[in-house]
Amino acid sequence: MVRYSLDPENPTKSCKSRGSNLRVHFKNTRETAQAIKGMHIRKATKYLKDVTLQKQCVPFRRYNGGVGRCAQAKQWGWTQGRWPKKSAEFLLHMLKNAESNAELKGLDVDSLVIEHIQVNKAPKMRRRTYRAHGRINPYMSSPCHIEMILTEKEQIVPKPEEEVAQKKKISQKKLKKQKLMARE
């Protein structure tokens, strides 16, 4: 079994998915992965489908040299964005795989959240292109490894009002006074 870079806090309530040596650009995939990190699984799936249809963009925050500006990036508080279709499709496949893993484990698929997603560089694949005057230049591809961990989100239960009212702070002086009154 392959080791993940992060162990889930509660392994019984989480599921994993990974892909190795995927023929998709590392930089585009990294930016797309950062955009869906922490999202609910249904929201992430809808977002990635919208990216392929160019209805929502992926904000390019780190690898943004020469990336043009787009109005859709304003939703993310950013100016530069693109629509990396292939990266979105690969991540959609990974989410689908993680979802089926969750069903197999018996988890509630509708409450899954992307807790951890990581994109690493894979060994480059080498090709060549022919240039003027008999020269040859490299024509490399930048594949990547992707891993993700999805976790069932617990519902936050509000505390009863009685307990909240009881926890009022009392100074040491008042506490001693109350004890003295109780003795008498």
UniProtKB/Swiss-Prot annotation:
GO MF entries: RNA binding; structural constituent of ribosome
InterPro entries given in the database record: Ribosomal_uL22, Ribosomal_uL22_CS, Ribosomal_uL22_euk/arc, Ribosomal_uL22_sf
Subcellular location: Cytoplasm
Gene Ontology cellular component terms for the protein in this record: cytoplasm; cytosol; cytosolic large ribosomal subunit; cytosolic ribosome; nucleus
Disulphide bridges, residue numbers: none
Cited function: Component of the large ribosomal subunit. The ribosome is a large ribonucleoprotein complex responsible for the synthesis of proteins in the cell.
Subunit structure: Component of the large ribosomal subunit.
Name listed for the protein in its UniProt record: Large ribosomal subunit protein uL22
